[in-house]
Amino acid sequence: MDGIRYAVFTDKSIQLLGKNQYTSNVESGSTRTEIKHWVELFFGVKVIAMNSHRLRGKARRMGPIMGQTMHYRRMIITLQPGYSIPPLRKKRT
């Protein structure tokens, strides 16, 4: 899985599953067309819409040094009725 890092399971994303919308974090350098092409090819589904937004990394401190985690992009993928994506693995914390 080149573009998709992991599926997102929040209260909102679980609600969106009822509307045939799937939420996942993807690599920040990926474009919408790359992700759409990859999802259609890998899962054999038809994508009708994609929404994306970039999320800033969180601030982290290691002793006196301030740093931050990497920025990332989140995609909400809407599929045509009748198609579904099997559950993706959850990120380990």
Curated annotation (Swiss-Prot):
<dbReference type="InterPro" id="IPR013025">
    <property type="entry name" value="Ribosomal_uL23-like"/>
</dbReference>
<keyword id="KW-0699">rRNA-binding</keyword>
<dbReference type="InterPro" id="IPR001014">
    <property type="entry name" value="Ribosomal_uL23_CS"/>
</dbReference>
<dbReference type="GO" id="GO:0006412">
    <property type="term" value="P:translation"/>
</dbReference>
<keyword id="KW-0934">Plastid</keyword>
<protein>
    <recommendedName>
        <fullName>Large ribosomal subunit protein uL23cz/uL23cy</fullName>
    </recommendedName>
</protein>
<dbReference type="InterPro" id="IPR012677">
    <property type="entry name" value="Nucleotide-bd_a/b_plait_sf"/>
</dbReference>
<keyword id="KW-0694">RNA-binding</keyword>
<dbReference type="GO" id="GO:0005840">
    <property type="term" value="C:ribosome"/>
</dbReference>
<dbReference type="GO" id="GO:0003729">
    <property type="term" value="F:mRNA binding"/>
</dbReference>
<comment type="subunit">
    <text>Part of the 50S ribosomal subunit.</text>
</comment>
<dbReference type="GO" id="GO:0009507">
    <property type="term" value="C:chloroplast"/>
</dbReference>
<keyword id="KW-0687">Ribonucleoprotein</keyword>
<dbReference type="Pfam" id="PF00276">
    <property type="entry name" value="Ribosomal_L23"/>
</dbReference>
<dbReference type="InterPro" id="IPR012678">
    <property type="entry name" value="Ribosomal_uL23/eL15/eS24_sf"/>
</dbReference>
<keyword id="KW-0689">Ribosomal protein</keyword>
<comment type="similarity">
    <text>Belongs to the universal ribosomal protein uL23 family.</text>
</comment>
<keyword id="KW-0150">Chloroplast</keyword>
<dbReference type="GO" id="GO:0003735">
    <property type="term" value="F:structural constituent of ribosome"/>
</dbReference>
<dbReference type="GO" id="GO:1990904">
    <property type="term" value="C:ribonucleoprotein complex"/>
</dbReference>
<comment type="function">
    <text>Binds to 23S rRNA.</text>
</comment>
<dbReference type="GO" id="GO:0019843">
    <property type="term" value="F:rRNA binding"/>
</dbReference>
